[in-house]
């Protein structure tokens, strides 16, 4: 096996750099939209191994990415904890907001076992994936998952969760610890089922001040990493604290993750400094893929020029948007791999 992504995570420089995209199995692909219709609901798609395998493999068949990422959602963890969860068109995920008292009644024992369909998807994907393609599992970071559990939906600045944390510090700390423990079990099961590496998505870390970032983002992720490595000491783990800004510095060392996922707001000069301490992943603005043309080419070239001589997995700085034209995705891949656009 020649798993380029794993080599980079381990600190090697691979040229051209391996490439995959967050949300690469998604609505920009016509084949995904067809499979999504068959599934009925979004959650049914996540929990139906045959269909989840199909959408996981679709971008690999079409583009030959160097990594496949398990098709699922970060909110299957609170769903397994017994929280009601539904996805509505145009509204995204919706849940009944959890209150402080309910947190003390959350039962975490055996919760990860309720996600067996996800592990079956991992097993089936690994069987069908080309040997040279890395299979990534993932979970949401406790802070980001907690924001949805508290507000009941996504909010622009996660004010409900921040206010909850200030008002109910004990309950909030318990929620983060519970989510960290269940998420660690969840990742352990994914690794056992055949995932080559895992990514922890902290999509809302950028709304916190420095003290809260340390307590709500770094400590819970470090707890996950420690628990995963107690079972799989060599586990390769990617951390993606989107929007962390200057607080990216020290994140790898404090949490124990191997590779840093960078969002598109991270200056390339700062990204290059972060790369000196280990592998980085990112960080093209997803809207450059929507725009195409010179905007896309210039964005790709700038990243390759600044970081291509070190350990880099080329990716977007967040998930690809449904509006992205397929031909622009191919143009990006060709440019990264040195072909003509």
From Swiss-Prot:
A Gene Ontology BP annotation from the UniProt entry: protoporphyrinogen IX biosynthetic process from glutamate
Site (Transition state stabilizer) location in chain: 73
InterPro entries according to UniProt: UROD/MetE-like_sf, Uroporphyrinogen_deCO2ase_HemE, Uroporphyrinogen_deCOase
Pathways involved: Porphyrin-containing compound metabolism; protoporphyrin-IX biosynthesis; coproporphyrinogen-III from 5-aminolevulinate: step 4/4
Location(s), subcellular: Cytoplasm
Pfam families: URO-D
Known catalytic reactions: uroporphyrinogen III + 4 H(+) = coproporphyrinogen III + 4 CO2
The UniProt record lists the keyword Transcription: no
Entry binding sites for substrate: 23-27, 42, 73, 148, 203, 318
Gene Ontology cellular-component terms listed: cytosol
Gene Ontology MF terms in the entry: uroporphyrinogen decarboxylase activity
EC code: 4.1.1.37
Function: Catalyzes the decarboxylation of four acetate groups of uroporphyrinogen-III to yield coproporphyrinogen-III.
Protein family per UniProt: Belongs to the uroporphyrinogen decarboxylase family.
Assembly behavior: Homodimer.
NCBIfam families attached to this UniProt entry: hemE (TIGR01464)
Protein name stated in the entry: Uroporphyrinogen decarboxylase
């Amino acid at each position: 096996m020649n798993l380029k992504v794993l080599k980079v995570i381990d600190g090697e420089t691979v040229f051209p750099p391996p490439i995959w995209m967050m949300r690469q199995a998604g609505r920009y692909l016509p084949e995904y939209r067809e499979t999504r219709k068959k599934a009925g609901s979004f959650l049914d798609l996540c929990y139906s191994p045959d269909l989840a395998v199909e959408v996981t493999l679709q971008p690999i068949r079409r583009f030959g990415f160097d990594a496949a990422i398990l098709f699922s959602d970060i909110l299957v963890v609170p769903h397994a904890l017994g929280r009601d969860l539904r996805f509505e068109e145009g509204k995204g995920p919706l849940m009944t907001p959890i209150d402080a008292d309910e947190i003390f009644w959350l039962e975490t024992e055996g919760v990860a076992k309720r996600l067996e369909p996800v592990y079956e998807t991992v097993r089936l994907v690994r069987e069908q994936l080309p040997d040279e393609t890395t299979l990534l599992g993932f979970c949401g970071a406790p802070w980001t998952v907690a924001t949805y559990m508290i507000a009941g939906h996504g909010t622009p600045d996660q004010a409900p969760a921040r206010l909850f944390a200030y008002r109910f510090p004990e309950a909030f700390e318990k929620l983060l610890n519970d989510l960290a423990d269940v998420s660690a079990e969840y990742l352990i099961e994914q690794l056992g089922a055949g995932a080559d590496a895992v990514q922890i998505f902290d999509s809302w870390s950028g709304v916190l001040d420095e003290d809260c970032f340390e307590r709500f983002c770094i400590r819970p992720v470090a707890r996950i990493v420690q628990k995963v490595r107690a079972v799989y000491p060599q586990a390769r783990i990617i951390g993606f604290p989107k929007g962390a800004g200057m607080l990216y510095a020290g994140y790898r060392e404090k949490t124990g993750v191997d590779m840093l996922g960078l969002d598109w707001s991270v200056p390339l000069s700062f990204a290059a400094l972060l790369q000196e301490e280990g592998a980085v992943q990112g960080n093209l603005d997803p809207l450059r893929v929507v725009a195409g043309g010179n905007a896309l080419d210039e964005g790709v070239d700038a990243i390759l020029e600044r970081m291509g001589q070190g350990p880099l997995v080329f990716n977007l700085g967040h998930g690809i948007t449904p509006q992205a034209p397929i031909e622009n995705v191919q143009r990006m891949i060709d440019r990264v791999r040195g072909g003509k656009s």
